[in-house]
């Protein structure tokens, strides 16, 4: 290898100056490299923003036509490409920080080298001075010699000749002294220059190695991005192939279909009825301008004719609740039930139509209660109002619906009355018979959790018994889900995109299904149990949750609260786990005293509802659908420590820590993920992982970046589609749960450092004949558990079957069947966490086997032994709780003899 010392000697000894300035040029190269990488990061950021704009353009694509679902494919692909280049920009910024850090270290090294090279600089200057003196003395000596030779040839007097010889001798002595000084300075220069040249060479080699490492990181980041871009492109092609033409057409028909009902058959001839001509002419009054065929009277048969034939041809039937059952219920009545807003042009000019409701409550032992309940029912019906944005009297609304709906109108009215009345009183003896079951019974088929059902957030934590990988390795970076837009069914799975129908279309399907089921027969069969009431209660609460009034109640006025709740849709995916907030709310409504019958029940309901804060849950993690509030999650870190202390020395031990990370999601967030397929990606970061040796993540739920350079942190983010499916499965298996635990990863750490163990042990065994004495010294390690306490501390010592005459200090419990001693110690901490245990016994024979070992058990909370911690990345989610706990596995101490 070429060395600076051999090649930078040269004329006038300028090699030192060349080496010093070359070292300074290294700083310039470092700064220029940082500027180059910064410019590349700016280019990547600009490209990422451009791709985000392109994704936004795709998301704003026309939702009309069969091609509309394909825009999701373009949006997801553009989002992922933007994420790839944004990630490259982040890596470039990290690289710039590394370059700047190296530049600072480089300045310190150069400053230190300059201080050390001052001696070399002085030797160079001294050598140059001595070289000048040497040249002068040489020239003086030579001139004196020439002068002496000239005088000798000229034959000058002896006296002058002696003077010339004396001057020549002095010049020779001066020249000899200069030679000696020059040689001495040259030797010093050679030694110091050799050392300095070696230092400069080491600095330059280290500089070039570091620069190559930085360039390699730059190249690796670009290569990873190119791989990710290739994966995104392959996924794009696969998604385009998966979404076939038939699927696009099917999705269009599901969303835009108008039904399979065909027009009625040929219309027959109808005879003229003169007896009803006057009534028909009276009923035909309408507005001056009216399109034929679109009015209500053109669409529906006359209610008077219907009543006439009903009275003359069939007897009236009365169900168990006292309502008159009419003979026919029109098919289109169901459609009217699902639509509050009528577009009939002649609605305002119609006169109110009268209908009769006959209430016959179930017989009760207390007749006064029945009469009071009837009065309360009348007051409640009088207080009912119409749906939002519809200022029409109850009388006109009821009369309008009575024209063609038959008995379905009073059934719906009484169903709504039952909801309000059930909230007002649960103490009246006849309330169940008159108004149906209480409000709580409407939720028996839904995920409803009361206060008594709420448990500790991690009490029932269950972990996966087996993960999806058999090797301890990192998660491959294959998903690249956008943090802002989760793909709606765009995945290599051919059925993935169609497995997430929109809530709107699903609700319409549910309405049609419910309408067909309710309107299938012309005459409903009476049943002893008020099924319509229970169904109405359930649908009413489902609709409140679906429409999201809790998020709007605080913003609207009390006038809005008094409006009747809209009709609902029962859907399989619309079931919601209502936690403690709704539990308290419903309990306070049902336990309130019975009010004055003349009071407005809905006004009382609105006052009670106004006291409840906005949101869907008030358990350990409140859920709100507001875009400004973050969604809560919780995490649990559980660790098990195994340790073995060799006999007599607490600083000789083997420690192994295994841990699990579990994340807990409130039940309400499942509905949010289902209703919002573009929910932000949940990301979290593990910090203080330098002591962890291996990670085993859940590869079906998590993604990570294997090229992260920080050895103390590791980032993960969720596959949101897989997470949503997992939470839905958990909700189906346990619909009453208020939270769902998801096991994320396992990890392992091993060490021979005694400071990693929270409790240090040192055991000794002394044998004297048949007597054996065992002592155990223990004390807490302050470096491991400075802020936590060890609880439930137990020490076990197994004994030989022939042991007798036991003596223990402090006293221990003796288990004769298992033949072991058990000490139960107080809680230990770093302040008061040391002590000694002693036990002695006598054997029938002299013991010759190995010394016994002691086992220790304890638990702790509030800290992790590995130091690992978890934090969320981003502001859309918040960590409401991080619970840390640890326990012992095999925690043993061997005795030294």
Swiss-Prot record:
**Membrane topology, from the record:** Peripheral membrane protein
Q: Which GO terms describe its cellular component?
A: clathrin-coated pit; clathrin-coated vesicle; cytoplasm; plasma membrane
Keyword field contains Lipid biosynthesis? no
Compartmental location: Membrane, Clathrin-coated pit
What does UniProt give as the signal peptide span? none
- Residue runs in coiled coils: 134-154
Q: Which UniProt keywords apply?
A: Coated pit, Coiled coil, Endocytosis, Membrane
Stretches with biased composition (Polar residues): 501-520
What's one Pfam family here?
muHD
What residues does the MHD domain cover?
Answer: 630-894
Q: What is the reported phenotype of gene knockout?
A: Embryos display dorsoventral patterning defects analogous to the one associated with Bmp signal failure.
Segments carrying the region annotation (Mediates membrane-binding) are 1-276
Single Gene Ontology BP annotation = clathrin coat assembly
Q: What is its main location?
A: membrane
Identify the residues that the record assigns to the F-BAR domain, covering every copy.
Answer: 2-248
Q: Does the keyword Hydrolase apply?
A: no
Subunit-structure text: May oligomerize and form homotetramer. Interacts with acvr1l/alk8; linking this receptor to clathrin-mediated endocytosis.
Role, per record: May function in an early step of clathrin-mediated endocytosis. May regulate Bmp signaling by regulating clathrin-mediated endocytosis of Bmp receptors.
* UniProt family annotation: Belongs to the FCHO family.
**Name used for this protein in its record:** F-BAR domain only protein 1
Give the organism, scientific name.
Danio rerio
